[in-house]
Every structure is written in structure tokens, then in C-alpha cells.
Amino acid sequence: MCLTNGKDRSKCLIVLLLPVFLMCGCIKHEVLSPVPSITGIRFVDSGQNATMYVEFTDGDGNFGLEQSDSLGIFSECINAYNLYAEYYELQNGNWVHIKIDPCDDPVPDPDVPYYYKIPWAKPTGQNQIQDGVIEIALTSWKIESDFDTVKFIVRIVDRDIQSSNAFEIGPLVK
């Protein structure tokens, strides 16, 4: 039927190509939660210093802070950070949280260990999903104490102040 004349061939071509175009429109794009998620952490100890690699996803692509983020919800001290690594020591068989909070000080210390401002890598294009690895250089990560085993519980927070899952790394021997 498609081989008889030019008019029929055009109709046949349309009928044959229509399913191809419809299938292309049905390609599913990955959908992730708009709440950020930590998917893994790798910790590399190099003596006094260490590096923490935090693997994460964010479905709406709004994880990260800009330098100008200091007003509104970001004016509260705790919201000025977006990666929190809480420090715990194993003391006499129990994990004890060693609170190091920059917001407890009337003049917050910008260099407080374990709270970080991760810059915003704005996604471009239609797919706004962020899927990446954050590299954190931990200088002097070993707090002086009588105990030698520690762990971190890490979480990230996006621009909507949505907190990720808490991800535990450790035990680590100092």
C-alpha cells in the first residue's frame, strides 16, 4: 500500500513515524524528592588532617548558599550553614555528643569546625536535579581528649531549610 504513489507514501510515512514521536515524548525523567539526601560518605584520614566526601542528591536543585545569603531565613546563625557534622566521642562505652555550636557564642566563630557553608552550584537546563560529591577538608579534626574513638553524624540543609537524612560515619580511631 505504501509503495503505490507519492501521496500514499507520505501518509504511510506519517503513520510509521507517529509512534516514534509519541515514544520520544514518553521518555521518563528521573524524579527525586525535593528534600536533599545524603547517599554516602567516605572518610580519608591522613594524620592530623582528613577529608570527608559527602555524596548527595537534591531533586529540586536548591542545595547550596550564595555569598549574598545573609538576610531573611539565612540571618539566623544556624541557617547560615548548610552542612553540619556533629562530633561524638565514645566515652566509657557510650557515645557522647561534643557540642561545638557557632551560635552559642555572641560573636559566632566563622571557622568553627564541622559546620560548613557549601556554595550553590545552580543547575542549568530543565533537569534541576543535583547529584554530586562535597569534599570537606578537615584540618585538626582530632579534638584533644582522653578518648580515642569518634564518629560524625552528618546532615545537609537546602535553601528551603529542608534537612536531609542523618548519615553516620565511624567509628573512627584518632
Could you describe each region identified by the protein language model?
Residues L3, L16-L18:
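Leucine-biased recognition of intrinsically disordered, low-complexity hydrophobic segments
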Residues I27-K174:
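Non-catalytic macromolecular-recognition regions in eukaryotic signaling proteins
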